[in-house]
């Protein structure tokens, strides 16, 4: 009986072991990934708690922030260079207009044209600079007070240019009008003196 039981047990174990292995493999497939995920999560938490790793991450974030600041500064400088180029062209056109304004009547008309050209350059440069500030404020890392300050500086520069041109044109117009009046009065005086001399000559001839 003992031998029969031993033979039956060995045969059953032979049939049961392969079946148990087949059942065990898919179960382990679904069980092992969560275990690995938990293990990775614990390792990651331990790495985050490590002060050396946290310092390295802080240094990396600070480095990226410095790069962003450098890019924003370069962008601001490029926009300022664009505005200054437009303003310089406006001043150049204004200077040519000043030179042409004092030449003659034709030069005066050309001077007005150059003044208008200078105003277009100054106004377009200022408007494009302010628009770029408002649209790219976040990329330039500028706060609202800084944007308002830049806008006030650009507007004041354009206003000073307009005041200078207006005062110069007005003063030249006044001087030109005075010169024309003096010439007319001088011509009148010279004509009157000629008439007076003619009268004197006539009176002298009658006396003789």
UniProtKB/Swiss-Prot annotation:
Superkingdom per UniProt: Eukaryota
UniProt membrane topology term: Multi-pass membrane protein
Keyword ATP-binding: no
Compositional bias ranges of the Acidic residues kind: 181-192
A Gene Ontology cellular-component term: mitochondrial inner membrane
Cell location: Mitochondrion inner membrane
The protein, known as: Transmembrane protein 160
Source organism per UniProt: Danio rerio
């Amino acid at each position: 009986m003992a031998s029969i039981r031993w033979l039956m047990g060995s045969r059953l174990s032979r049939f049961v072991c392969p079946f148990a292995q087949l059942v065990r493999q898919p179960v382990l497939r679904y069980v092992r990934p969560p275990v690995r995920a938990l293990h990775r999560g614990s390792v990651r938490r331990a790495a985050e708690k490590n002060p050396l790793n946290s310092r390295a991450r802080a240094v990396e974030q600070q480095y990226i922030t410095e790069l962003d600041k450098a890019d924003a500064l370069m962008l601001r400088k490029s926009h300022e260079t664009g505005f200054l180029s437009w303003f310089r062209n406006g001043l150049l056109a204004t200077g040519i207009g000043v030179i042409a304004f004092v030449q003659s009547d034709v030069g005066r008309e050309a001077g007005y044209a150059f003044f208008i050209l200078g105003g277009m350059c100054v106004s377009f440069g200022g408007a494009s600079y302010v628009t770029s500030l408002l649209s790219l404020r976040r990329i330039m890392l500028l706060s609202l007070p800084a944007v308002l300050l830049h806008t006030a500086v650009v507007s004041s520069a354009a206003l000073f240019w307009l005041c200078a041109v207006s005062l110069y044109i007005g003063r030249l117009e006044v001087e030109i009008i005075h010169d024309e009046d003096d010439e007319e009065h001088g011509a009148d005086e010279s004509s009157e003196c000629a008439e007076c001399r003619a009268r004197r000559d006539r009176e002298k001839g009658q006396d003789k």
